Structures are given as C-alpha cells and as structure tokens.
Amino acid sequence: MGDRRRFLKELAMVSAAAVVAPDIVAKSSNVNEKTVREAVRAADDFMIVERKNALPITGTFLDEISHDIPHQNWGVQQWDADFRNMKAIGIDTVIMIRSGYRKFITYDSPYLIGKGCYRPTYDLLEMFLTLADKYDMKFYFGLYDSGRYWDTGDLTWEIEDNKHVIEEVWQGYGSRHKSFAGWYISGEISRATRGAIRAFHDMGKQCKDVSGGLPTFISPWIDGKKAVMASGSALTKEEAVSVAQHEKEWDEIFDGIHDVVDACAFQDGHIDYDELDAFFEVNKRLADRYGMQCWTNAETFDRDMPIKFLPIKFEKLRLKLEAAKRAGYDKAITFEFSHFMSPQSAYIQAGNLYNRYKEYFEI
C-alpha cells in the first residue's frame, strides 16, 4: 500500500510538472519513464476483491448460426486468431452451438440440403474441427435446429432430422478428427416441456451409440424474471419460477435423461445476482443425485441493458463465476467468447472484458 501511494504521488508530481514546466521534466534525471511506468502499474492495486476466487471459464460456444446475434463475417484468419486468444486464457473446449438453424447450415450436408437448406459458402464444421485439432481443444458438435420446436413447443419435432445429421456428421467428420470429443443437444428448454425428455433421450442415445459413448450435454435456461423474449422491449417479467418448482421439474427431467446425458450447463443470465446461490445449489444437488456433471453457462452478454446484446460488465460476470465456485460446479462455459469477450470482437467492450478477466485470474 505504501509503494502504491508513493508511486501515485510521484505520478501526480510528474503530471503537475509537465503542465508547469515541460522543459524541466524532459531534462530531469529524477523523473523518468520507469517512475511513470511503475506508478501506472500500481493502479492494479485498486482491485479490492480476492483474485481467482471464482470458477474460470474453460469452454465457449461458437455462435456461427445465430438466432439473434449479428454476424461478424470472419474468415479462417480471424477464427484462427480467436482460437489462439481463447487458448491464452485457459479455454480448452469449444462447442458449435448448432449445426444449422432452419435453412442456414454450417457444413455441406447432403441430407439437409436435400430438404431445402442453403448450401453454405464455407465448411465451418471442418474449419472449427481443424482449428480445435491445431490448438489441442475438445470440440462438441451442436445438433441441428429445424425451428419446428420453437413454432410448436414440442421438442420431439427435432428427433427425425437429427437421426440423419448425427450419422452424417460422425461418418464424415467425427471419426477423422482427434478433437471431436462430444455432442451438444441443442434444444433449449427451461421447464417441463412437451416432448423434452423423449427428445433428449433419443438424441442423446443415438449420439452415444454412433460415437462409442462420447459425452453429451444440454444447456437449458432457468425461467427467472429475466427470461423474456429477446425481440421484446421488456427486461423482466412478473411471473418467474420458484426455486422449489425449478427443483421439482428438473428432478423429473434428469430422472428421464441421465443415462444418456452426461452434463447440464444451466444458462446463468435469467435470474438476479442475489438468486444465484439458491438456484446453483439446487442444480448441483440434482446433478449429483443423477451422476451428471454440473456446468454453468456463464453468459458474457448483459441482459440488464435495453440494447440487446452487449458485453457484460466484468463485475456481473465475476459474481456469477464466484457463485459457481461456491456451489462446487464442475466446469464453466460461456455464451460466448467471440462476440462478447474476444479482443477482436466487433464490440470494443469485449476486449476490455478480456483484459479485466485476465487481471482477476492473474493470467
């Protein structure tokens, strides 16, 4: 603390002298560049919370086929740099959030193109797997989303198309790439949903059967007060699920899927920060009961802002990751690095979040 005060005092003297007598400053041997560097570096001491007291992010979604996030139009050079930036902060797992949404797809799929999907310009699946191989990361493949679940509320609509996609992808890609490490069942739910248990079970079982038992996971949201439509103007809603009801419904869901779904990464952005511990404790207890891993999907975008969506304030991210550590979660992944945390994101705040994260975790 004494060193910090001394450095800051010297920096103040330098600044004042520069205004009053710049020639003197330039010639002075006592006030030099090293003093200024040390004084500025001492500003790091302004962090007042305990560092590294949170669960670090070790995985990220790759949101190349998005519902509601603007496309960055990156090519392989930008993606290569982004994988390098991920690796630099300890990310070892990348998850393609979905292999397609309605008619837009990520790879040259004979089945989906035959059903009317557009042929993609680039084989993004091959590119992501190649980069994951290069940077020694684990790659999880996200299943296809036809959009019919969102239209009907019945998740079983997604089973048939994914029977073909799972087989096609494993034969064409998974068996060739060392990084292909598992499957993401991409249907998102929050409550007891029509067809959810059957759909998760059928798709999870097929993923495991074709790949020799590679792990699967899901990433539902919690139906909290921030669970509002992204297309609407409201930031919160009156009706939100209670902790007890959340536990009851997810106990039933886990009971029906735990033999073919290995992990659950609940999205953390739909509840308030003072609710994190209560919901996280329930999530971990349920996962332990059914022998599943409990991950957190730590959202790096801010649901509290009227502009949808911008990078989150670091303090909010810290609160969520600290709660995950207190609950004993197994892993933290994020939605998602490339838009909201990357130094090369279209949002300048994302690079600042990256730097604050590195400071906190002393990377």
Question: What is the predicted role of each segment?
Answer:
Residues 1, 22-51:
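C-terminal segment of N-terminal export signals and the immediately downstream linker at the start
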Residues 1-15:
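N-terminal secretory signal peptides and thylakoid transit peptides that target proteins
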Residues 11, 29-32, 294-295:
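Residue-level detector of intrinsically disordered/flexible regions characterized by low predicted structural confidence
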Residues 16-22:
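Hydrophobic h-region of N-terminal signal peptides that target proteins for export
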Residues 40-363:
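Glycan-processing catalytic domains of CAZymes
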